[in-house]
Amino acid sequence: MGTVSRAALILACLALASAASEGAFKASDQREMTPERLFQHLHEVGYAAPPSPPQTRRLRVDHSVTSLHDPPLFEEQREVQPPSSPEDIPVYEEDWPTFLNPNVDKAGPAVPQEAIPLQKEQPPPQVHIEQKEIDPPAQPQEEIVQKEVKPHTLAGQLPPEPRTWNPARHCQQGRRGVWGHRLDGFPPGRPSPDNLKQICLPERQHVIYGPWNLPQTGYSHLSRQGETLNVLETGYSRCCRCRSDTNRLDCLKLVWEDAMTQFCEAEFSVKTRPHLCCRLRGEERFSCFQKEAPRPDYLLRPCPVHQNGMSSGPQLPFPPGLPTPDNVKNICLLRRFRAVPRNLPATDAIQRQLQALTRLETEFQRCCRQGHNHTCTWKAWEGTLDGYCERELAIKTHPHSCCHYPPSPARDECFAHLAPYPNYDRDILTLDLSRVTPNLMGQLCGSGRVLSKHKQIPGLIQNMTIRCCELPYPEQACCGEEEKLAFIENLCGPRRNSWKDPALCCDLSPEDKQINCFNTNYLRNVALVAGDTGNATGLGEQGPTRGTDANPAPGSKEE
């Protein structure tokens, strides 16, 4: 009995223990299904329970794994705390486990209202920061685009022309582009008492037309107009020498009428439509030309000529220009005319520049003996300036700005950019002898040397300077024009066989046409070497103001 009763008691205890165990598991499952019991369970695990179960650690540490194993848990969280906006959904899903545990620890099992402020406080700054990071770059970008577009628009617009008269606005010389039916200034204005002084104004210059500034195909009417203007200006120069205004005006009118008549004859000699005024006759023709004249006051100026003026004052041509295939001829052919200015300030910097120029000219002389060797001149230029920079840097003063560069193409480019005379033409002045003016005589009466492939040109200039430079300034131009005409008459008369006439000017009839041919082909561009040429006089040549007879020697032929 005792044994049986003990066995029954043990079985009863086991049954009770089994029943209690099943009830505990069911209660545990029910507690996990409710959010209130969930928070309480987490609270108990955090403070009173032994080491938390693996499932609870995964919730605290790895919420992504928990979301896979417990989908109802996150669904329940969304029901309790819905997101304020669709943009906040990823923020709440990421940060929910992080803010969940501290709130539960501090406030107890069910405190969703206290968790809401924390959730609302943290995400908005994060979203606001993202907006600040994205928006500011967009605004400067718009500003940059506006700044870049506006200058481009302004650069594309032509600036307003100045109100002052521009001599190059109506310039025909060297013109490029579309040509019209007439040259600028054609037909010329008819001489009258109103424009008499302007026509004979010594400072008034005119454009000489020829193949260099007129199209050679398809515009023969422009060539006829240019020839008429050339002949007209030649006649004007002759008439303006008359001392009486009455005789001068009568001469100008006859020259103008004769030029217009010859123009119409040339118009009818070709099978093209003639000028509309040429269809008339007599006074009606002249009145038509007078009415069609674009500038009856003769205020048109010629194209601005970019000339290198004579050296004024002691100026040192430093740094020298970079030798190139284009200027190597000037380097060699004009070397004997390049004189170093005198009376320079005795400063160390200028003396070092002068020493460099003197050394460079010596090297140029060696290179020119090799047949205008461009490579030799370039190496001499580079070596001379490198040596100059070595001396500059050896002194504790401010060296030349280009010497701050090391020996490199950058230094060479710096010196070449600062060269005042890159073509080595400092003392070369291009003169136009087609119209003798007081300014022209002022340039010819100075010390200089003429460079021309035509040997008769230096003789002409010497006759003009010897006989006219001693006269009063107002009379020099008239004297020079008379000497020019006399010299042309002499060349086409007794000395006709002493020189070659490539343009066949002497075959034309004397007076205006012949003189115009000389002006166009021989006297338009004459190079004059200005300054002191004393060092070059011992080479078998004399300057225009030194010597007594510069006429071409009989029998001397020149190309």
UniProtKB/Swiss-Prot annotation:
Q: Which residues form the signal peptide?
A: 1-19
Where would I find glycosylation on this chain?
A: N373, N463, N535
Give start and end residues of every sequence repeat: 170-298, 302-424
The principal localisation class reads secreted
Which Gene Ontology MF annotations are present? interleukin-2 receptor binding; protease binding
Residues found modified as Phosphoserine: S556
- Tissue note: Expressed in the surrounding connective tissues of developing long bones, but not in the cartilage. The long isoform is expressed in a number of tissues including liver, heart and lungs. The short isoform is expressed in skin and cartilage-containing tissues such as tail and front paw. No expression is found in brain.
| Region of interest called 2 X approximate repeats, as start-end residue ranges on this chain | 170-424
Task: Enumerate the PANTHER family for this protein.
Answer: EXTRACELLULAR MATRIX PROTEIN 1
* Name of this chain's protein: Extracellular matrix protein 1
Organism the protein comes from: Mus musculus (Mouse)
